[in-house]
Amino acid sequence: MSASDLTSVQATAPQGRRQILVTSALPYANGQIHIGHLVEYIQTDIWVRTLRMHGHEVYYIGADDTHGTPVMLRAEKEGLTPKQLIDRVWTEHKRDFDSFGVSFDNFYSTDSDENRVLSESIYLALKENGLIAERAIEQAYDPVKEMFLPDRFIKGECPKCHAKDQYGDNCEVCGSTYLPTELLNPYSVVSGATPVRKTSTHYFFRLSDPRCESFLREWVSGLAQPEATNKMREWLGDAGEAKLADWDISRDAPYFGFEIPGAPGKYFYVWLDAPVGYYASFKNLCDREGIDFDAWIRAGSTAEQYHFIGKDILYFHTLFWPAMLEFSGHRTPTNVFAHGFLTVDGAKMSKSRGTFITAQSYIDTGLNPEWLRYYFAAKLNATMEDIDLNLDDFQARVNSDLVGKYVNIASRAAGFLIKRFDGRVQDSAMNHPLVAKLRDAIASIAAHYEGREYSRALRQTMELADEVNAYVDGAKPWELAKDPANAVALHETCSVSLEAFRLLSLALKPVMPRVAEAVEAFFGVAPLAWADAAKPLSSAQPIKAYQHLMTRVDPKQIDALLAANRDSLQADAAGAAAAGTTAANAAKDAKSAKANAKAVAANGADDAPISIDDFAKVDLRIAKIVACQAVEGSDKLLQLTLDIGEEKTRNVFSGIKSAYQPEQLVGKLTVMVANLAPRKMKFGLSEGMVLAASAADEKAEPGLYILEPHSGAKPGMRVK
């Protein structure tokens, strides 16, 4: 829906009442909600409230994602059963969502009978359709804990840079990716034991089946975000490429989750039953409230289904989930909306700097949750762009927009109306041109919200607030009040101001629902909907005494928030020390810390900022790939011959073979680290490093992308 679709106030009323099911990604049940999570839940909640204000039948569904090895191991560490842990975390998560006004119709758990039944039925339907395969695979196995180990539960020495204590899938020092079998001196993070290789039968969803590929090629054409469509097409490849791989949907005991029907000791991988949890939570609500569940989720249903997610889990929601639904006889998502990541003050959230901010610490510090809702909304749009919470800008924007512009309007007019006119507006003032302008703008503001262009909606709203304040400044009600002869003009000014304030409150209601409730009580009106733009204040209903709606952000509150989250880091560290660790892990941690000290100093820890002098040590150069070939005997490496403007070319080995054919790269410009010490490899000498991007979780969002400068750059140019 675009602004042109809504050209009048009347257009804000629904032409037909839609049935809409909306979800946000499920938070994992082994940690606290932080402000990075809240971006998504606030984004979704604003959209849901917008649709409800149109009068549609909307259900916003959520749940905790409870299964998997991390939950099982954390519960063991805390001396709890997994059930006890997830029940406690559910209470904490529900508290945090309530604090920030996230209006779930049902917030449930994936560890439920409804989810078990639905997961089993979907699995059995896929099996009936010939889309489940059994295969023997070899995995790392902890002989002490008698369990198979996920990649992130294995550590060892990086096979590339030889940094100690690195995860089984990637090195945090040099950034290399590799297989767990390539780690040197590996050990289990659970027990400290050396893993052994063990074969096990696993179950796979046959995503490579031509039926799945054909369906997904058609389904992707309906995605609203071009970035998502492009990424999907990249994963699918061209017709005939057969790029889709089958998906391992099983895990071996011990595992906290649902056992696979007919497969004792085998459990559904958490990513199979987690999205089914959307339906399970909705089923729980339907059973309580007498809603026809099947009418909403069966194939061919006219109900709409939307998923809001982070861009890091696009892979699961646009490949596996739609295909699972399609071939198990369910409706597929109407659309999937992905958002970007959150940074704080331009950097990754950091515990050492206090910017890894938990939802509860924000509330405990006394900060208004609607301040954060407003700030995030002012940054959000319909793309997958990352957004930044700049704490200075947060303070300035809240104080300027919400207090200085918006709330100030009511405080300047309400007292005069109550004192001089018995709290009753002048009915003729409801036809004032300024009021008409605001009334007409509501339709386009509502359309911006529905199009997920929240920043546009708020920009338009604040531009209107500026006009209202200019009107008040020009009319000067405080001067008019000095002379009884100006009573009519004073009455009009106050009435226009308060009706404008009502319309601005309507425009802000999806973002600041609690302020809207207070405004509704102040005016003595029913909950505002979009159609109420055409229902102005009336002299028949006097306003109530004005109560202050919002305070300014105090810089001391921001300081306290950062301090509280730095304190939480210290508390976590103290708790970890008190809880203790295995002797094997403690010894390895101490040894690896010493071994990695130089590497960390050179590369920088995630949370430690580097100086400009440190950055200046890295010599980044534009390089032209003049030749490229596969490396015989390596599944990952390409050999690049690079021209960086020197007398001789450079030879570089790069682990990008999975993403590029050699002929694709010849002639391209890229960026390389030119002053990296040469490294002797078994295939030859590597004289630098080319830069490439990848997702933090390459399993969830696979892909490598070399950096390419804009046209005009030439080999040898410095990047600075």
Curated annotation (Swiss-Prot):
One GO CC term on file = cytosol
| Principal location | cytoplasm
Question: So what does this thing catalyse?
Answer: tRNA(Met) + L-methionine + ATP = L-methionyl-tRNA(Met) + AMP + diphosphate
Q: Show where the tRNA-binding domain sits.
A: 614-720
> Which GO terms of the molecular function aspect are on file?
ATP binding; metal ion binding; methionine-tRNA ligase activity; tRNA binding
Cofactor note (record): Binds 1 zinc ion per subunit.
Kindly list the cofactors needed. Zn(2+)
Positions of short motif 'HIGH' region: 27-37
Q: Which HAMAP family match?
A: Met_tRNA_synth_type1
Stated role = Is required not only for elongation of protein synthesis but also for the initiation of all mRNA translation through initiator tRNA(fMet) aminoacylation.
Q: What is this protein called?
A: Methionine--tRNA ligase
The species is Burkholderia ambifaria (strain MC40-6)
User: What gene is behind this protein?
Assistant: metG
